[in-house]
């Protein structure tokens, strides 16, 4: 009888643990679904604006009214709007790939990856007359998904270039080095001449978050750049932060 009581007690404990885990899993699924709904609601809102602009331009040109008689001007504006929409759709596809694809890492020379990304951005940096300071070792290897890390470096560099004012003395500084132990790396990208309100820092990795309402439309950003960076770094188990420095903004991560 005593043994039966122990077995029953053990079974009840296991059932209780299983129920608690089930509740936890259900709650987690609810949170994920809530985030997914919020994300697609934001996507719908973000696409609605350029579609409305396009519709207005095309309607005005077809009717030939007022300022819309200058068809070449509004055709150019319409093309720019569709290019922004195309950029957003590409970023949305990236989000989908990150969420659905099997995450595979391999030993990768991320120093070479970062150098190539900087070379690709050289013209953008020169066009804004920004100073570029680079400190990258000849080689630095890490177990990463190389395609996804390319996206991290690309988004971070583009973000720094877009939001650095075109003023004399402003610069972008890129640092890559071994981390505090031999298995990790540390990367830092800093841009000067701009600051982010402290209350906005915690929201920067949210999809479509804007520090200022007009910021993305002025700079051409999709509103998904840092959100994608966050997703990729989370999958790599990396730690990261973004904050103000004495003369600008700095993003850093370790993995």
Predicted segment positions?
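Short alpha-helical segment of the dimerization/phosphotransfer core of two-component systems
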Residues: 77-85
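Conserved catalytic submotifs in the C-terminal HATPase_c
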Residues: 106, 126, 131-141
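Coiled-coil phosphoacceptor/dimerization helix of two-component systems
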Residues: 84-96
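Primarily the dimerization/phosphotransfer
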Residues: 27-61
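Short conserved segment of the HATPase_c
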Residues: 196-210
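Conserved glycine-rich
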Residues: 237-238
């Amino acid at each position: 009888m005593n043994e039966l009581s122990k077995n029953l007690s053990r079974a009840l404990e296991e059932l209780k643990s299983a129920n608690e885990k089930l509740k936890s899993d259900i709650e987690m699924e609810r949170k994920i679904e809530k985030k997914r709904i919020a994300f697609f609601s934001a996507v719908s809102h973000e696409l609605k604006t350029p579609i409305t602009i396009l519709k207005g331009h095309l309607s005005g040109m077809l009717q030939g009214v007022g300022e819309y008689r200058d068809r070449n001007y509004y055709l150019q504006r319409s093309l720019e709007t569709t290019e922004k929409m195309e950029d957003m759709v590409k970023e949305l596809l990236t989000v989908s790939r990150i969420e659905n694809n099997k995450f595979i890492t391999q030993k990768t020379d991320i120093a070479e990856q970062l150098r190539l990304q900087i070379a690709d951005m050289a013209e953008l940096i020169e066009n804004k007359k920004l100073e570029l300071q680079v400190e990258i070792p000849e080689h630095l290897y890490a177990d990463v998904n190389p395609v996804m890390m390319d996206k991290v470096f690309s988004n971070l560099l583009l973000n720094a270039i877009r939001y650095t004012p075109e003023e004399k003395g402003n610069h972008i500084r890129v640092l890559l080095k071994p981390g505090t132990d031999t298995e990790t790396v540390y990367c830092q990208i800093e841009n000067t001449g701009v600051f982010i309100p402290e209350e906005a820092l915690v929201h920067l990795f949210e999809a479509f978050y804007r520090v200022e309402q007009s910021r993305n439309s002025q700079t051409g950003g999709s509103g998904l750049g840092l959100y994608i960076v966050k997703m990729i770094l989370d999958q790599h188990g990396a730690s990261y932060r973004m904050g103000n420095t004495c003369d600008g903004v700095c993003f850093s991560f370790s993995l």
